[in-house]
């Protein structure tokens, strides 16, 4: 899926989720319809993933640095073999959630009040 990419340069692993591509953007709009606080800019994707990963995949948050922007969600890891695995797992999680968007909507419907939105 071309809306999420991993790049490696120097001692850094960078994962970028392009939230302005059609499919993620449309899903973000639906998430916002479900919960007014969930206007899905990069900062609220950070809030969502902080919550979702913390609850379901806390190991992925170890060593992660978030760098969201209005139109994208980016994370960095220091380059290690372990962090490369984490980045690949995070990419797979993002793809799974976007390709199976009902999972996202379920979290928003049932747990939005637990998320620290921007």
Regions found by a protein language model. Name each.
Residues 1-25:
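N-terminal, charge-rich interaction modules
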Residues 8, 29, 33, 92, ...:
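Polar/charged alpha-helical tracts
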Residues 16-62:
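Surface-exposed, low-hydrophobicity interaction/linker segments
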Residues 45-103:
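Amphipathic protein-protein interaction modules
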Residues 49, 103-118:
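Short proline/glycine- and acidic-rich turn/helix-capping motifs at secondary-structure junctions
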């Amino acid at each position: 899926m071309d809306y999420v990419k991993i790049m490696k340069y120097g001692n850094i692993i960078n994962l970028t989720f392009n939230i302005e591509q059609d499919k993620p953007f449309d899903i973000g709009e639906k998430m916002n319809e479900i919960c007014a606080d969930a206007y899905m800019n990069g900062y609220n994707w950070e809030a969502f993933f902080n919550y979702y990963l913390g609850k379901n995949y806390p190991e992925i948050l170890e060593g992660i640095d978030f760098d969201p922007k209005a139109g994208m969600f980016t994370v960095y890891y220091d380059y290690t073999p372990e962090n490369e695995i984490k980045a690949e797992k995070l990419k797979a999680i993002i793809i799974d959630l976007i390709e199976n968007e009902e999972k996202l909507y379920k979290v928003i419907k049932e747990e939005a009040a637990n998320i620290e939105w921007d």
